[in-house]
A protein has these predicted regions:
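Strongly charged
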Residues: 1-86, 90-200
Length: 200
């Protein structure tokens, strides 16, 4: 039986995309699907590795108002409505393809590889005192932080402005792909790794 190779949104082929970072090969899922909606089938430990990376990006858009554990910002453009979040990502991908001339899914994967932090700090308590301790970031958390920082950077740039969230998301992904210093996700990565270096 011939294997059907679905394209993302029936527009972009992802069969040829290779993950360069060896630490992320097992956690960035590029399984070809026509409809990127898993309906919560993978809500188990490490189940995120079975969810396509584009769907994970769409899921992050529903939480752009959260900063740490609190919902601080009300942004009506990004809600829990799946069809709306899918439209934002689709529009962003079309902008990326128009500006770069490349497959937007590949641009997203390269951006994730470049902005996913390798080190961060945690707090350890010793003798009643609390000390920051540098720790390595697990591969799944690296991807989660990269996607979260991309979406937060995009929503912050669109908040209170006429710019659409899809436009700012496309810009943020392109800046991260180019390793441009204006990318807020790249700045957060460098900040996290600098804090970890100082806590060693």
């Amino acid at each position: 039986m011939e294997k059907i190779n679905f394209k993302i949104f029936d527009m972009w082929d992802i069969s040829e995309i290779q993950i360069v970072d060896p630490g992320l090969r097992g956690v960035i899922n590029l399984e070809p699907k026509l409809i990127l909606k898993s309906h919560g089938r993978n809500v188990v430990k490490h189940g995120q590795t079975k969810v396509n990376v584009v769907e994970r990006l769409m899921n992050k858009i529903a939480l752009t108002g959260h900063r740490n554990k609190k919902h601080r910002i009300e942004l009506g453009r990004s809600t829990g409505k799946y069809s709306r979040n899918m439209k934002i990502v689709l529009d962003a991908f079309q902008i990326i393809e128009k500006k770069t001339g490349k497959n937007p899914v590949e641009v997203l994967v390269r951006a994730i590889e470049k902005i996913s932090p390798r080190d961060e700090t945690t707090i350890i308590e010793y003798g009643g005192a609390r000390y920051p301790q540098a720790v390595d970031v697990s591969p799944i958390r690296r991807v989660n932080l990269a996607l979260k920082n991309l979406v937060h950077g995009a929503s912050d740039k669109a908040f209170g402005k006429k710019k659409k969230l899809s436009q700012s998301l496309a810009e943020e992904i392109i800046l991260a792909y180019e390793e441009n210093g204006e990318s807020s996700a790249l700045r957060k990565k460098k900040e996290s790794e600098a804090q970890a270096d100082s806590a060693r």
